[in-house]
Amino acid sequence: MLKVKRLEEISSCHSSNPLEKVAFFQCMEEVEKVKCFLEENSGDLDLQSGDNEAEENVWSNRALDERIIVKGGRTSALTDDIPAPAAPFDHRMVMAKHASVDNLYTVSKSEILGGGRFGQVHKCEEKATGLKLAAKIIKTRGAKDKEDVKNEISVMNQLDHVNLIQLYDAFESKHDIILVMDVEGGELFDRIIDENCNLTELDTILFMKQICEGIRYMHQMYILHLDLKPENILCVNRDAKQIKIIDFGLARRYKPREKLKVNFGTPEFLAPEVVNYDFVSFSTDMWSVGVITYMLLSGLSPFLGDNDAETLTNILACRWDLEDEEFQDISEEAKEFISKLLIKEKSWRISASEALKHPWLSDHKLHSRLSAQKNCNSGVLNLTTK
């Protein structure tokens, strides 16, 4: 059985920065033997990859025909299933201004909301309106960096959904580009590693429904996120169950006839086709959805090794299980949901639309049972603490 680390350990010993090309291929050299073995055993499936790419697109066209592209419609009536609030401004088309952000906004350099490979996110306020926002300051070292950020702006201009962070303004200077966006509470990752935050299966259902709704919308717009992970899921506030997906810096426009390959991402969440430098598609995001589900339910990382090379080896082998004690009280529906996503052959994974129809996310009787179980456990906890 694959040895996994708790997320508390991950946060202290494992970097979540995306792989640089050199580091990526250095890791790949170490797992080449495993890769070759796996390719020999899956050759028949790989021959079908071209057809599978076309087949994966059928459901998206059908969804468009049915006119179900929604800005934030809900798919269930759970007690806590309240839609995430819309951004405090109308969706707008943004172009980077060649001007100073300080002309229109007060950026608080001391109030840092988060950070990553790109730089830092600071609290900011629009001077004319007092609107509270967030300023993502992205350092750009050359033309390629600027092109990447402008791609992120282009992607965000196309996305208008309550579960996706919204872009308000942008500014370009010689050494950076600043994106002014809607501001939210904190990372879902913070909740996972918080010992005082007891995520239940029902909580996880609420989170995953919203993630799938946001991803379904992106896929209907033919956009792949390609960097889904708990750090890129923001909770609206500390206590609410509403979330928004952020960071579209690695997102790509998906054109089925133009085979897309990528060699970036966060090791733990990479799909096998990314590790293999094979074609990616909608189902590449769905693999990451499976990993996130596994983490939220158990606090464990399904493929994490002692180093990046071992992690990639585990992913290529699709080596995971549900045998840890953390899954003892998890429903069979949840386990089946994960098993529909963590599949090496990408064409076999369920789509975001299909995920939302899966019993784990759509069965009201199951949700009622889990709610009763949650209330029962809360009652027992209250008695023991008195």
Swiss-Prot record:
InterPro entries: Kinase-like_dom_sf, Prot_kinase_dom, Protein_kinase_ATP_BS, Ser/Thr_kinase_AS. Gene3D superfamilies: Phosphorylase Kinase, domain 1 (3.30.200.20), Transferase(Phosphotransferase) domain 1 (1.10.510.10). It is an enzyme of class 2 (transferase). It catalyses: L-seryl-[protein] + ATP = O-phospho-L-seryl-[protein] + ADP + H(+); L-threonyl-[protein] + ATP = O-phospho-L-threonyl-[protein] + ADP + H(+). GO terms for molecular function: ATP binding; protein serine kinase activity; protein serine/threonine kinase activity. The active site is at D227 (proton acceptor). Transmembrane segments: none annotated. SUPFAM superfamilies: Protein kinase-like (PK-like) (SSF56112). The keyword Nuclease does not apply. It comes from the Eukaryota. Residues 107-361 form the Protein kinase domain. Its EC number is 2.7.11.1. Belongs to the protein kinase superfamily. CAMK Ser/Thr protein kinase family. This is Myosin light chain kinase family member 4. The gene is Mylk4.
